[in-house]
């Protein structure tokens, strides 16, 4: 019997083990490998690698050709290929490296050229990545000018219209002619007004000696009114979901405009009264736009998928809307901070497209699913294993093969395992499975077991960053073959030969999970408590493998139990830590889904401790800010000992409601230094119902804008 199922370093006809795919490029003087699209640039230095599909391979210098062909105009005098360019995703060794706008544009453009089946245009990723970098103090203080150049390149509104066209393709809906014409005209008007305002600011800054600030104040007031008048044109009744990505970009332009006014108040000679007014506007519009976007997404999701639908459709909608709108919403409430590295993100997903026994899930299944794919999210992913069977059947029309993956188990650094998903079969049960197949199918002529056994050589520095998950029809007469393959910088491993890869710039795979086949026996769908290892069972086994992607990159190492240690930026920049990434906890906790929060929150009850392990340079001083929703009698920070006393955010909050969470940021008063290893210990007392949404470590001397 020929065994085509290899879990080690060999390659069989159908199942690939730890073997690198052909076509990956490396430079002899550099470490590691690059993406399939990597090419060498002939006309530049011998040490240069350019990871962009060539337009003219034989040109001595193809930068101009690439720029012209792809419509990439250098924004900050950087070329497409640069000696310090790091290929997308392959290494997680320099999380704090600043990228130029041109580099971000090139990365997301390459991603778009190679991304299967997603309608998302590259510009939405560029804008989000740029904004995340711009939250740091060393970034430009005039964000609006750069965002205008990104969203309206060459003084054209075509890029913004591309966002609308892409959303129309995804949701399979189009604006009526009158609304489409009105939106197009509004985009042109917005572009013209932004150009005029940016020019007026430039003129003022160049000729301000002896000139009254009234001119710039008039320009600011005019621009503010134009934003207020134009934003409703992207909130047309009946088309709210379709217009949401476009609204998110327009709202981001307005909020960065307000932020620029506040940050540059001294340089622009803005009076105190005017500054106070615009600070109030800033806070009010962050809340107004956030609530609109979050409620529009929630209503759209429920309308689209109620009462039940496939998880594939649900996760694709979540991923699309996260990339196109919700990532920006997550940033809006953090714009008040002037020096911050956002370390995590909402999850993106790649889910296998196999259709055998797929079934539909009620919309209420979501909290259960969201809990079991993240219940071990504070650990560092190290691999995945599983077992399955391949059946060979014979019919009068010929033979066909059929794969049946029975279970998978995810493993993490330190030996921790995630929930067993599917069905764990004993030898006796496997024999019984064979008998069942013989009794219920076409003539069974062959039967083999196979194992999935993928382990990362370097899970921290070279995690999985791409997946190829699909199921191919074996022949017209029947059968399906599984293809579930995972790619890191060091290895490619999985079942079958990979097809198109799914990855996202600056995202890494933080968990591998699966759905189970529907058969009426999946009775316990209550959400898992955090860290619970409850099996996710089905006698029919695994249906779709799922890869979970996140921006989490600043991992200094792991604790003895395998949980992650969070690296503070070396230059004293503030940073965030996800509440889902503790090193230990003794308080009853569950995962609470949030839409606009750079990830989900930890829902706490009762009293107990949460521990987080950090690593810093031993010099920079920080204050800890907790983003909280709910009520508690006291939260105590140990070392230094300081407390947040009784609070209730139901009446005292930021004015934003995120899937039921009404939050406020609370700061501990005592600053502290983060040495090479520092444990943050939080004690929660008298908690009735509390969402811990974010931990924000601010530079001790920094003050929020409001």
Swiss-Prot record:
Which top-level group of life is the source organism from? Answer: Bacteria
Q: Which GO terms describe its biological process?
A: sporulation resulting in formation of a cellular spore; symbiont-mediated killing of host cell
Keyword Phosphoprotein listed: no
Q: Name one GO molecular function term.
A: toxin activity
InterPro entries, alphabetized: Galactose-bd-like_sf (IPR008979), Pest_crys (IPR038979), Pest_crys_dom-III (IPR005638), Pest_crys_dom_I (IPR005639), Pest_crys_N_sf (IPR036716), Pest_cryst_cen_dom_Cry2A/18 (IPR015214), Pest_cryst_cen_dom_sf (IPR036399)
Swiss-Prot/TrEMBL keywords: Sporulation, Toxin, Virulence
Q: Name one Pfam family in it.
A: Endotoxin_N
Give the protein's biological function: Binds to the brush border membrane vesicles of scarab larvae and somehow damages the gut wall to allow the vegetative cells of P.popilliae to enter the hemolymph. Active on M.melolontha.
Similarity field: Belongs to the delta endotoxin family.
Q: What is this protein called in UniProt?
A: Parasporal crystal protein Cry18Aa
Q: In which organism is this protein found? A: Paenibacillus popilliae
